[in-house]
């Protein structure tokens, strides 16, 4: 594609958005609001194959459904307040469970239950809950309220022949685009279609995850899991970590690893640490709602071209955390670039790419932090000391809670990884942890019979 300068959206310009997940909805919300503010009349259409009304995987964008504290706040500032029909549960703390015990972490920063858990679709397969509103459906409605048209069709072909991208479905043209926004995530064959356009775009690397919805009843969920997300660092082969997210009658079990499967979930539910949290006599259901989505663990190559930009998971996303928050960041940056600067390759390179690069660079620090966390969790003496220090902090025996804050920020995704990295490597923290480990070692050697 030739490089053109001065491509701008003029009155009547048509913007086609493939994907009505968070990234597609955010893009059209921000771009249409900005267009109104600067007095431009633009035409937005989202093409989304799902309606987000069905139960189970067919109506859902398959994720753990944790809306980070920072995103809840950013949305509120945009005037988007999540209603109680969307929020399944408010979260106020995290529990970390290891072979050697559990520790609860709270953050003094968190406003009351400021993290929300949601279902992305109409709820788990087989669920009888009636008052569930999908998070993605809610955002899509916000886009419609801003004047965007939504068409529930699959875009199965894109052509670039006339200079403007053309979208097709079943051989019929849907529209020509003055700007095409790729907000199709990483789960779809659509990404391959875009790679073949020859603009240099390459989809981000992904790993497989597994998600399961287990029904335990609201009372059990409330009493055993509370308003907390539970992270399990249990050294189950093939599993990096497992999170449990309470959602009313259900818990969502989200596992990341090499090739997580249903058997990993069954092994986990049978693990003594987890068994304690299940009703006595609990039997793993024969059938339960589960899926194997892919999770973005890197950056797309060249997520833009003339009249073309890729946002959300199809562009750049934060490692393991806050993917929806990343969709918010990239969609907003792409919308502002398109409306305020132009839709040429050079415009996106100048104003959109730096935002993606910030996320991509930050993920390098995230990768280091998660590797360090893996290392700590797999070596029992180190893991024991680390969680002991955190426990002391949280019990209020120490004034500050730097270790707890590091874990909190890593797992909630509420701070940039670089910032967490700098704090985690502070000489004071490292020396303190080492001194606790050495003290614990000598205690074990010289006073083996004293209690821990
Ligand atoms: C196991 C797991 C757990 C996660 N947990 C969290 C979490 O707790 N919190 C968090 O913030 N993030 C989480 N994420 C990441 C989060 O799911 C993504 O970052 C987020 O969904 C990205 O939004 P998106 O709009 O870019 O893509 P998606 O949500 O994937 O939306 C893409 C949309 O495009 C549509 N589409 C694709 N191709 C076409 C086509 N050709 N025609 C029409 N429609 C099309 C799809 O139907 C879909 O609706 C998790 C991910 C995984 C895999």
List PLM regions with ranges.
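Glycine-rich FAD pyrophosphate-binding loop
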Residues: 32-60
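Beta1/beta-strand and adjacent pyrophosphate-binding region of the FAD-binding site
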Residues: 6-23
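Predominantly flavin-linked oxidoreductase catalytic cores and closely associated redox partners
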Residues: 30-33, 141-277, 317
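FAD/FMN-dependent oxidoreductases across multiple families
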Residues: 127, 174, 259-337, 343
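C-terminal helical "tail/cap" subdomain of flavin- and related membrane-associated enzymes
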Residues: 339-452
């Amino acid at each position: 594609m030739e490089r053109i300068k001065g491509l701008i959206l003029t009155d009547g310009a048509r913007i086609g958005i493939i994907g009505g997940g968070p990234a597609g909805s955010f893009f059209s919300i921000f771009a249409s609001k900005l267009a109104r503010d600067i007095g431009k009349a633009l035409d937005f259409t989202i093409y989304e194959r799902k309606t987000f009304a069905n139960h189970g995987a067919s109506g859902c964008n398959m994720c753990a459904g944790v809306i980070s504290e920072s995103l809840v706040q950013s949305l509120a500032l945009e005037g988007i307040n999540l209603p109680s029909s969307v929020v399944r549960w408010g979260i106020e703390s995290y529990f970390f469970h290891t072979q050697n015990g559990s520790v609860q972490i709270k953050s003094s920063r968190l406003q009351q239950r400021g993290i929300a858990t949601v279902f992305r679709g109409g709820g788990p397969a087989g669920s009888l809950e009636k008052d569930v509103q999908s998070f993605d459906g809610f955002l899509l409605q916000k886009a419609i309220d801003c004047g965007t048209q939504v068409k529930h069709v699959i875009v199965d072909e894109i052509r670039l022949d006339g200079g403007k991208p053309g979208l097709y479905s079943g051989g019929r043209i849907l529209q020509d685009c003055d700007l095409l926004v790729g907000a199709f995530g990483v789960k779809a064959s659509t990404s391959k279609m875009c790679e073949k356009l020859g603009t240099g775009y390459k989809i981000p690397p992904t790993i497989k995850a597994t998600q399961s919805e287990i029904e335990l009843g609201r009372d059990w969920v409330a009493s055993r899991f509370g308003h907390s997300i539970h992270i399990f660092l249990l050294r189950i082969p093939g599993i990096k970590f497992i999170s449990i997210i309470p959602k009313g009658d259900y818990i969502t079990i989200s596992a990341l690893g090499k090739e997580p499967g249903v058997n990993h979930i069954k092994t986990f539910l049978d693990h003594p640490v987890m068994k304690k949290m299940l009703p006595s006599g609990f039997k793993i259901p024969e059938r339960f709602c589960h899926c194997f989505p892919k999770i973005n663990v890197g950056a797309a190559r060249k997520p833009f071209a003339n009249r073309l930009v890729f946002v959300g998971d199809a562009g750049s996303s934060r490692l393991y955390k806050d993917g929806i928050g990343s969709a918010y960041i990239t969609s907003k940056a792409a919308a502002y670039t398109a409306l305020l600067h132009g839709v040429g390759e050079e415009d996106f390179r100048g104003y959109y790419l730096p935002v993606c690069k910030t996320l991509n660079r930050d993920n390098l620090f995230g990768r280091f932090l998660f590797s360090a966390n893996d290392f700590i969790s797999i070596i029992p003496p180190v893991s024991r000391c680390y969680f002991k220090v955190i426990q002391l902090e949280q019990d209020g025996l120490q004034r500050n809670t730097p270790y707890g804050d590091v874990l909190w920020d890593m797992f909630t995704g509420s701070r940039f990884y670089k910032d967490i990295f700098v704090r985690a490597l502070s000489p004071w923290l490292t020396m303190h942890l080492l001194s606790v480990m050495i003290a614990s070692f000598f205690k074990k050697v010289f006073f083996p019979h004293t209690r821990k």
